[in-house]
Structures are given as structure tokens and as C-alpha cells.
């Protein structure tokens, strides 16, 4: 514990020094870019590229909804896709622009996504500017609710998946990771996207069922899930997944 605290203090001192010298942002961007190529990260990075290559190929269009600082975008770009990168949070948006702003295969949109066009209040974690949510339920009832204080807010413009599709065309793949706001995002979609993934947490599993039922209302769809950042489906066939959802 003492060693961990010392390392955290050292990390903070280094960040403060780099920030004072206006070096933190370029150094951090370099770290993000080379991180996948660290020896201990190469195999997981390759596995994820192989996994997503099952769904998309070079030239396909993808949506990264709730892009954070572009970790999914990075995998998709390595496959050769084009990515519409959507992120409302200022700090994350700044990071995405620094990393991908000059990439012609990336379109960066500084908006949130929801059921309808409007302006909403985005809650931002006091301890980490990179964690934010539009969901009151996620702030109050998720397993993360005791870990963060939500004293900061940001007014954000909200668009819909249908609007994005109308402007950029139907994507082959769409990833949605919006900290408990996934169902609201899906309610702004009236078309079936060939491949779509959304995040859910075990303590808010009923919300995941709502997402699945809504997608089923759009047409014939199949479901499975992966655990965490793994690169294999949890269930080998659809029927096991259906039985699990009925529990």
C-alpha cells in the first residue's frame, strides 16, 4: 500500500511537471499511440483486430459512439475502415482531435447521442475528466457510483443515430459505450445496422434486456456477448443466449 501511494505521488509529480512545461499533452498522446505495441500488449491488440475483422473489412464505415479517446477507433482504423467518432466530453474530444484530427479516415463529432435532438446535461467525474454520463440511473445505481463524485457538468448537444446515418450513410458496424445511456441511444435508431455492440453492466442487466427487445422490434436480429475486453463470444450458439436472457 505504501509503495502504491508513493508511485501515485510520483505519477502526479511527473504529470504536473510535464503540464507546467506544456509537454503533458504531446507525451500522453505519444503514449496512447505506442501503447498497443508494448510487448505485453501486442498479442491482445492483434486478437482484437482479428476479432473485429470478422465483422468489418477495409473501406467499411463504422460508428464509434462514446469514443472516449478513441481506443475502439484505433482498432477499426488498423483494419482499414472509416470511422465516425462521436464524443461530447470536452477533455476526451480534445484528446481525440489531437490524435486523429488529421486522419482523413476519421470524422470527429463533438456531440452526445440519444433518442432525440436536444441539449442535455452531461455529468463528469470529479476524480477523472474522462468518465462522464448522461444517465442519472448509472450515476446512482451502478457499481461505480461510490467511486466517483459528479460535481462537474457540461451542457452538450444531442443528436440521434438516425441523423448520423442520414448524414454519413448506414455503417457496417456501430459500437455504443455511453455509461448507462445505451437504451436512450438505441431509441434514436429506426434501421437495422448489420453489426452493433453496446456495453452493459451486470447490476443494470434489465437495461440490457430493454436494448435487446428494442433491437428485436426493428427486425430479425441475432445476439451474443463478450465479457469485458475479451475477443470471443460467451455463448457458442443463439439458443444458450436466449435461455440466459430468460433468467
Regions found by a protein language model. Give the residues of each.
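Phosphate/nucleotide-binding beta-alpha loop and adjacent structural elements of enzyme active sites
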Residues: 1-247
Amino acid at each position: 500500500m505504501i509503495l502504491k501511494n508513493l508511485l501515485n505521488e510520483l505519477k502526479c509529480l511527473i504529470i504536473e511537471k510535464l503540464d507546467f512545461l506544456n509537454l503533458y499533452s504531446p507525451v500522453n498522446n505519444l503514449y496512447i499511440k505506442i501503447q498497443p505495441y508494448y510487448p505485453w500488449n501486442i498479442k491482445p491488440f492483434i486478437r482484437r483486430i482479428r476479432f473485429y475483422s470478422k465483422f468489418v473489412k477495409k473501406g467499411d464505415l463504422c460508428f464509434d459512439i462514446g469514443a472516449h479517446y478513441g481506443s475502439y477507433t484505433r482498432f477499426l482504423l488498423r483494419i482499414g475502415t472509416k470511422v465516425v467518432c462521436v464524443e461530447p466530453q470536452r477533455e476526451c474530444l480534445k484528446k481525440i482531435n489531437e490524435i486523429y484530427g488529421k486522419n482523413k479516415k476519421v470524422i470527429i463529432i463533438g456531440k452526445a447521442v440519444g433518442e432525440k435532438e436536444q441539449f442535455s446535461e452531461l455529468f463528469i467525474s470529479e476524480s477523472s475528466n474522462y468518465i462522464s454520463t448522461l444517465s442519472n440511473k448509472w450515476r446512482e445505481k451502478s457499481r461505480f457510483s461510490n467511486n466517483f463524485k459528479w460535481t462537474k457538468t457540461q451542457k452538450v448537444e444531442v443528436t440521434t443515430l438516425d441523423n448520423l446515418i442520414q448524414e454519413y450513410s448506414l455503417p457496417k458496424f456501430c459500437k455504443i459505450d455511453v455509461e448507462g445511456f445505451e437504451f436512450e441511444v438505441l431509441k434514436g435508431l429506426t434501421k437495422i445496422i448489420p453489426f452493433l455492440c453496446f456495453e452493459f453492466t451486470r447490476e443494470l442487466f434489465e437495461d440490457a434486456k430493454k436494448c435487446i427487445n428494442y433491437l428485436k422490434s426493428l427486425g430479425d436480429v441475432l445476439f451474443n456477448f463478450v465479457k469485458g475486453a475479451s475477443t470471443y463470444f460467451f455463448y457458442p450458439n443463439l439458443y444458450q443466449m436466449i435461455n440466459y436472457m430468460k433468467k
